[in-house]
Amino acid sequence: MRKHLNVIIAYTIMLGLIILVGIFQSWNVALSIFNMCLISAVMTIGANIQWGYAGLINFGLMGYAALGGLAAVLISVEPVQEAWVAGGFSILMSLWLIVVMVFAIRFLLKNFEKSKIRTYGIAAIIITGIIIIRVTSETSIEAIENVNPATTGFLGGLGLPIMFSWIVGAFFAAGLAFIVGKVALGLRADYLAIATLLISEIVIAIIKHEDWLTRGVKNVIGLDRPVPYEIELQTKEWFINLVAKFNSGKLDLISSITDKQAALNQLVIEGSSVFVKLCYSGLFLIVVIALLIVTQKALYSPWGRMMRAIRDNEEAANAMGKNVAKQHLLIFILGSAIVGIAGAMLVTQDGLFTPGSYQPMRYTFLIWVMVIVGGSGNNFGAILGGFAVWFLWIEAAPIAFFLINLFTVGLADTHSLKIHLIESVPYFRYLMMGMGLLLIMRYRPKGILPEKIEIK
């Protein structure tokens, strides 16, 4: 109990801050923050596995999160039959050609020694395949995108429950990580960081511009939900009775039947939103707890100790007979798969897929700040960083308004300084992020909950 005291205190403070938001702002806001903290925690677990366990820098988290979001679309959206008729066959043939290309490249890699002939052969296969795919599918793609472009204009998905996309998103991200890892993990750390960032930008560019697959920047809205809709709950008798029972004290103070009914209706509307967010909280919490248990077991297993040995002294681990390249690839795939799960969870909660919203600041560097602030190498620290940084990211505006009003209490509302400060409120979050990161790096360089090596 004593050795976990810091963890208990830190998480108690974090939970207390979220409860205070619920009391002084609203429970809707508090639960929205809590749910996004849970999704951020999943992303930080993925990043922490790569950096904290193995010392791998991955600035391409955004791309893996986007693939998770894409999985939510491809799994849950109903197939667009007209689009499949217009050009589905050609797309399937192109996919088969890609599979053939992969097997051809794999054949060259396995059966020919490293030479110019093998390199030129692989390049020829890739270039020829791209040309054939482009020529044969261009007309079909145009036909697909012209099928009711205002609402569809793409092939759609499989029409399955969206929860399946959480697993599929992990496989999508893992597949990309395998390709990237095979190509880039041999690079030096700084080059690896640049390469992963550029690859994630390529992924986002493809998702934005391949309308036949994702609708591009036209977005996909109205995705399936694993929880009830608010409007449905508001008509359910059991839910109305539950809200009435929960708020009986408030309702008893109202004497007028008409006013009491109006108050109950308002409470039902507010309660439905809170109930839906609580359902999401339960689902997300299950994922976070499951990942935490698995990653903790892995961290203190022989495999986890081997990964830390590789991280701390790669040459020594290699000399001891450990396959460093293989383990780096494995950890890179696992971390990316977890980020893919988080991406699918985010789109599931939002109910829409917006490729234009994927920005490196939000989906890569903010996640890295979370890991650094919380404590890399410590799963509890990484999760805490996800909570703390996202809480500050959202609550920066209310905090800024409070501080501005406090320090300009003697100034008129029309004063130029006060107006300028209020107009600058959206930028205070960047100031607070920078100050917070500087303070952590100065006074807690290993994070709020630093890594602890247990010798057993």
Tell where the protein language model's regions lie, with residue ranges.
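Transmembrane alpha-helices and adjacent helix-loop boundaries
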Residues: 1-456
